[in-house]
Curated annotation (Swiss-Prot):
Belongs to the actin family. Keywords: ATP-binding, Cytoplasm, Cytoskeleton, Hydrolase, Nucleotide-binding. Actins are highly conserved proteins that are involved in various types of cell motility and are ubiquitously expressed in all eukaryotic cells. Essential component of cell cytoskeleton; plays an important role in cytoplasmic streaming, cell shape determination, cell division, organelle movement and extension growth. It catalyses: ATP + H2O = ADP + phosphate + H(+). CDD domains: ASKHA_NBD_actin. GO terms for molecular function: ATP binding; hydrolase activity. Its EC number is 3.6.4.-. There are at least 7 different actin genes in tobacco. This is Actin-66. The keyword Nucleotide-binding applies. It comes from Nicotiana tabacum (Common tobacco). GO terms for cellular component: actin cytoskeleton; cytoplasm.
Length: 336
């Protein structure tokens, strides 16, 4: 969250609501019944953590309202009724979801005006393009969204319920097989950190597995909060490989490369060339080292041989949706 015209968000925190697992015994400690974002993260050892947004769609409106309240009053420290707001939503978001969002903004927070933008379109704005296909992969959901001259092509948008949280789960499973136990919602956050710090995408998965078997070059160690050190090897690339091979976790879905290709093939034959040449990655789950090269390799294999393929991975892609929103909301034409 932040202000239009800024080049980076003022507040970045996870959409988590944490509730105490135990009853408070110290009088006057001012214990709350719910903690939001970073505070929930830091006190996670005694909390049950819940995500009100599942697969990119809000599933718990009371918690979502708490998160918005926290954003306005504690993070940005502005009165919501004094500013117009730009909110974002996942592509193919149910209409009822958008209506509920609008209702809460107007009735609970009394905002003077608001606009709901599609996340992937904003990412494309942030990359300085008006035509391209965006692969947006966050925590709960991935989408491929073809956009031509600023218009999203709804018939060709594809959704894949495979994203950051599934990769964290997958890594939790692999680590459990290795004898490390991560069970609570709080411990899952530790695994997420391991994933963000150490995981990468292999250019050639089979070859990388061979390398990992024969040498210790891929091994890295990670210190857990209690001081115990774990070593992870092939897990580093086995976990993000799920993006390209969902069958590894028993999902009957096409990988992100195939989904991108299928999305392009659903578009008019005349615009495919422009889409192949502007494949833009966005969202936290596209932050793995090596993902752009692998994506380029996989799509080149699927596309016609003469086709020029370009995968763009902007360094700020973790926040490119926000940056695109900042650009859009600061346009005078938009404000009218």
């Amino acid at each position: 969250a932040g202000f239009a015209g800024d080049d980076a968000p003022r507040a970045v925190f996870p959409s988590i609501v944490g509730r105490p697992r135990h009853t408070g015994v110290m009088v006057g400690m001012g214990q709350k019944d719910a903690y939001i974002g970073d505070e929930a993260q830091s006190k996670r050892g005694i909390l049950t953590l819940k995500y009100p947004i599942e697969h990119g769609i809000v599933s718990n409106w009371d918690d979502m309202e708490k998160i918005w309240h926290h954003t306005f009053y504690n993070e940005l420290r502005v009165a919501p009724e004094e500013h117009p707001w730009l909110l974002t939503e996942a592509p193919l978001n149910p209409k009822a979801n958008r209506e509920k969002m609008t209702q809460i903004m107007f009735e609970t927070f009394n905002v003077p005006a608001m606009y709901v933008a599609i996340q992937a379109v904003l990412s494309l704005y942030a990359s300085g393009r008006t035509t391209g296909i965006v692969l947006d992969s966050g925590d709960g959901v991935s989408h491929t969204v073809p956009i031509y001259e600023g218009y999203a092509l709804p018939h060709a948008i594809l959704r894949l319920d495979l994203a950051g949280r599934d990769l964290t789960d997958c890594l939790m499973k692999i680590l459990t097989e290795r004898g490390y136990s991560f069970t609570t919602s709080a411990e899952r956050e530790i695994v997420r950190d391991v994933k963000e710090k150490l995981a990468y995408v292999a250019l050639d998965y089979e070859q990388e597995l061979e390398t990992a078997k024969s040498s210790s070059s891929v091994e890295k160690s990670y210190e857990l909060p209690d001081g115990q050190v774990i070593t992870i090897g092939s897990e580093r690339f086995r976990c993000p490989e799920v993006l390209f091979q969902p069958s590894l976790v028993g999902m009957e879905a096409a990988g992100i490369h195939e989904t991108t290709y299928n999305s392009i093939m659903k578009c008019d034959v005349d615009i495919r060339k422009d889409l192949y040449g502007n494949i833009v990655l966005s969202g936290g789950t596209t932050m793995f080292p090596g993902i752009a090269d692998r994506m380029s390799k996989e799509i080149t294999a699927l596309a016609p041989s003469s086709m020029k393929i370009k995968v763009v991975a902007p360094p700020e892609r973790k926040y490119s949706v926000w940056i695109g929103g900042s650009i859009l909301a600061s346009l005078s034409t938009f404000q009218q």
